[in-house]
Protein backbone atom coordinates (compact mmCIF):
# COMPACT_ATOMS: atom_id res chain seq x y z
CA UNK A 1 0.00 0.00 0.00
CA UNK A 2 1.32 3.43 -0.93
CA UNK A 3 1.15 6.47 1.31
CA UNK A 4 1.26 8.73 -1.75
CA UNK A 5 -1.98 10.74 -2.01
CA UNK A 6 -4.06 10.49 -5.17
CA UNK A 7 -2.95 13.05 -7.74
CA UNK A 8 0.42 13.73 -6.12
CA UNK A 9 3.64 12.89 -7.91
CA UNK A 10 7.26 12.93 -6.86
CA UNK A 11 9.47 15.68 -8.22
CA UNK A 12 13.15 15.17 -9.03
CA UNK A 13 14.11 15.74 -5.38
CA UNK A 14 11.74 13.05 -4.12
CA UNK A 15 9.29 15.58 -2.65
CA UNK A 16 5.64 15.39 -3.58
CA UNK A 17 4.16 17.98 -5.92
CA UNK A 18 0.51 18.98 -5.71
CA UNK A 19 -1.21 19.08 -9.10
CA UNK A 20 -1.15 22.63 -10.45
CA UNK A 21 -1.84 24.57 -13.62
CA UNK A 22 -0.61 28.16 -13.79
CA UNK A 23 -0.81 30.68 -16.62
CA UNK A 24 2.59 32.37 -16.82
CA UNK A 25 1.83 34.55 -19.86
CA UNK A 26 -0.78 35.22 -22.51
CA UNK A 27 0.09 36.90 -25.80
CA UNK A 28 -1.05 37.81 -29.29
CA UNK A 29 1.32 36.07 -31.68
CA UNK A 30 -0.45 37.24 -34.85
CA UNK A 31 -3.53 39.34 -35.53
CA UNK A 32 -4.81 40.37 -38.92
CA UNK A 33 -8.01 41.99 -40.10
CA UNK A 34 -8.80 42.62 -43.74
CA UNK A 35 -11.84 44.34 -45.17
CA UNK A 36 -11.11 44.26 -48.91
CA UNK A 37 -14.38 45.89 -49.99
CA UNK A 38 -14.43 48.75 -47.48
CA UNK A 39 -16.00 51.23 -47.40
CA UNK A 40 -18.68 49.81 -49.72
CA UNK A 41 -18.86 46.58 -47.72
CA UNK A 42 -19.81 48.53 -44.58
CA UNK A 43 -23.26 49.52 -45.85
CA UNK A 44 -26.34 48.00 -44.17
CA UNK A 45 -27.37 44.59 -45.54
CA UNK A 46 -30.77 43.00 -46.00
CA UNK A 47 -29.56 39.67 -44.63
CA UNK A 48 -26.76 38.60 -42.36
CA UNK A 49 -23.56 37.51 -44.08
CA UNK A 50 -22.34 33.93 -43.99
CA UNK A 51 -19.60 33.62 -41.39
CA UNK A 52 -17.16 30.71 -41.45
CA UNK A 53 -15.02 30.11 -38.37
CA UNK A 54 -12.04 27.75 -38.12
CA UNK A 55 -10.41 26.83 -34.83
CA UNK A 56 -7.11 25.07 -34.20
CA UNK A 57 -5.10 24.27 -31.07
CA UNK A 58 -1.41 23.38 -30.85
CA UNK A 59 0.84 22.77 -27.87
CA UNK A 60 4.62 22.60 -27.59
CA UNK A 61 6.82 21.92 -24.57
CA UNK A 62 9.13 24.74 -23.50
CA UNK A 63 10.63 22.83 -20.57
CA UNK A 64 9.72 19.87 -18.39
CA UNK A 65 6.91 21.84 -16.76
CA UNK A 66 6.21 24.75 -19.14
CA UNK A 67 4.12 24.50 -22.31
CA UNK A 68 3.19 26.94 -25.07
CA UNK A 69 -0.45 26.44 -26.06
CA UNK A 70 -1.61 28.30 -29.17
CA UNK A 71 -5.24 28.89 -30.11
CA UNK A 72 -5.84 29.96 -33.72
CA UNK A 73 -9.17 31.52 -34.68
CA UNK A 74 -9.97 32.40 -38.29
CA UNK A 75 -13.23 34.07 -39.31
CA UNK A 76 -14.42 35.06 -42.76
CA UNK A 77 -17.66 36.95 -43.47
CA UNK A 78 -19.06 36.54 -46.98
CA UNK A 79 -22.11 38.05 -48.64
CA UNK A 80 -22.70 36.18 -51.89
CA UNK A 81 -19.33 36.25 -53.59
CA UNK A 82 -18.13 39.38 -51.75
CA UNK A 83 -15.71 38.98 -48.84
CA UNK A 84 -16.76 41.48 -46.18
CA UNK A 85 -13.94 40.74 -43.78
CA UNK A 86 -11.34 38.13 -43.03
CA UNK A 87 -9.66 38.00 -39.63
CA UNK A 88 -7.12 35.69 -38.04
CA UNK A 89 -5.85 35.57 -34.49
CA UNK A 90 -3.05 33.39 -33.18
CA UNK A 91 -3.29 33.68 -29.40
CA UNK A 92 -0.94 31.87 -27.07
CA UNK A 93 -0.44 31.10 -23.45
CA UNK A 94 2.51 29.78 -21.50
CA UNK A 95 1.32 27.29 -18.91
CA UNK A 96 3.22 25.72 -16.04
CA UNK A 97 1.86 22.26 -15.31
CA UNK A 98 3.14 20.26 -12.34
CA UNK A 99 2.08 17.11 -10.55
CA UNK A 100 -0.19 15.89 -13.36
CA UNK A 101 0.12 12.24 -14.44
CA UNK A 102 1.40 11.85 -18.02
CA UNK A 103 -1.84 10.21 -19.21
CA UNK A 104 -3.73 13.43 -18.36
CA UNK A 105 -1.33 15.85 -20.06
CA UNK A 106 -2.80 15.80 -23.59
CA UNK A 107 -6.38 16.46 -22.44
CA UNK A 108 -5.11 19.22 -20.17
CA UNK A 109 -3.09 20.86 -22.97
CA UNK A 110 -5.75 20.52 -25.67
CA UNK A 111 -8.95 21.01 -23.65
CA UNK A 112 -8.37 22.94 -20.42
CA UNK A 113 -5.63 25.33 -21.59
CA UNK A 114 -7.48 26.54 -24.72
CA UNK A 115 -10.67 26.79 -22.65
CA UNK A 116 -8.82 29.27 -20.41
CA UNK A 117 -7.46 31.22 -23.41
CA UNK A 118 -10.72 31.35 -25.38
CA UNK A 119 -12.53 34.25 -23.62
CA UNK A 120 -9.56 36.54 -24.22
CA UNK A 121 -9.19 35.48 -27.86
CA UNK A 122 -12.93 35.89 -28.41
CA UNK A 123 -12.78 39.46 -27.10
CA UNK A 124 -9.84 40.32 -29.37
CA UNK A 125 -11.78 39.06 -32.43
CA UNK A 126 -14.90 41.00 -31.33
CA UNK A 127 -12.85 44.18 -30.90
CA UNK A 128 -11.10 43.72 -34.27
CA UNK A 129 -14.37 43.31 -36.18
CA UNK A 130 -15.98 46.23 -34.33
CA UNK A 131 -12.93 48.42 -35.00
CA UNK A 132 -13.16 47.36 -38.65
CA UNK A 133 -16.61 48.94 -38.88
CA UNK A 134 -18.74 45.80 -38.44
CA UNK A 135 -20.80 44.57 -35.51
CA UNK A 136 -18.59 42.71 -33.02
CA UNK A 137 -18.23 39.04 -33.95
CA UNK A 138 -19.07 37.13 -30.77
CA UNK A 139 -17.84 33.60 -31.39
CA UNK A 140 -19.97 30.97 -29.65
CA UNK A 141 -18.27 28.94 -26.92
CA UNK A 142 -16.17 26.11 -28.34
CA UNK A 143 -16.37 22.50 -27.17
CA UNK A 144 -12.64 21.81 -26.88
CA UNK A 145 -13.32 18.34 -25.45
CA UNK A 146 -15.19 17.37 -28.62
CA UNK A 147 -12.41 18.87 -30.76
CA UNK A 148 -9.83 16.84 -28.83
CA UNK A 149 -11.81 13.61 -29.18
CA UNK A 150 -12.19 14.21 -32.92
CA UNK A 151 -8.46 14.92 -33.24
CA UNK A 152 -7.57 11.71 -31.37
CA UNK A 153 -9.97 9.68 -33.56
CA UNK A 154 -8.40 11.14 -36.72
CA UNK A 155 -4.88 10.36 -35.48
CA UNK A 156 -5.91 6.77 -34.64
CA UNK A 157 -7.45 6.37 -38.10
CA UNK A 158 -4.27 7.70 -39.74
CA UNK A 159 -2.05 5.36 -37.73
CA UNK A 160 -4.33 2.41 -38.60
CA UNK A 161 -4.01 3.25 -42.31
CA UNK A 162 -0.19 3.42 -42.02
CA UNK A 163 -0.03 0.02 -40.28
Swiss-Prot record:
Domain of life: Bacteria
Molecular functions per Gene Ontology: unfolded protein binding
One Gene Ontology term, aspect cellular component: cytoplasm
Chief place where the protein resides: cytoplasm
Biological process according to GO: protein folding; protein tetramerization; protein transport
Record keywords, A-Z: Chaperone, Cytoplasm, Protein transport, Translocation, Transport
Record SUPFAM superfamilies: SecB-like
Location(s) in or outside the cell: Cytoplasm
Keyword Cell membrane in record: no
Listed Pfam families: SecB
Database matches in InterPro entries: SecB, SecB-like_sf
Record-stated family: Belongs to the SecB family.
Subunit structure: Homotetramer, a dimer of dimers. One homotetramer interacts with 1 SecA dimer.
Function comment: One of the proteins required for the normal export of preproteins out of the cell cytoplasm. It is a molecular chaperone that binds to a subset of precursor proteins, maintaining them in a translocation-competent state. It also specifically binds to its receptor SecA.
Protein name, entry field: Protein-export protein SecB
Species whose genome carries this gene: Brucella canis (strain ATCC 23365 / NCTC 10854 / RM-666)
Upper taxonomic lineage: Bacteria, Pseudomonadati, Pseudomonadota, Alphaproteobacteria, Hyphomicrobiales
Gene: secB
Amino acid sequence: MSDKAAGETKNGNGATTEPSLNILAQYVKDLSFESPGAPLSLRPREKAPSININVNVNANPLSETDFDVVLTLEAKAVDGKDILFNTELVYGGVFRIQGIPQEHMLPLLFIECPRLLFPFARQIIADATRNGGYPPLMIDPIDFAQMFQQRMAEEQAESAVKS
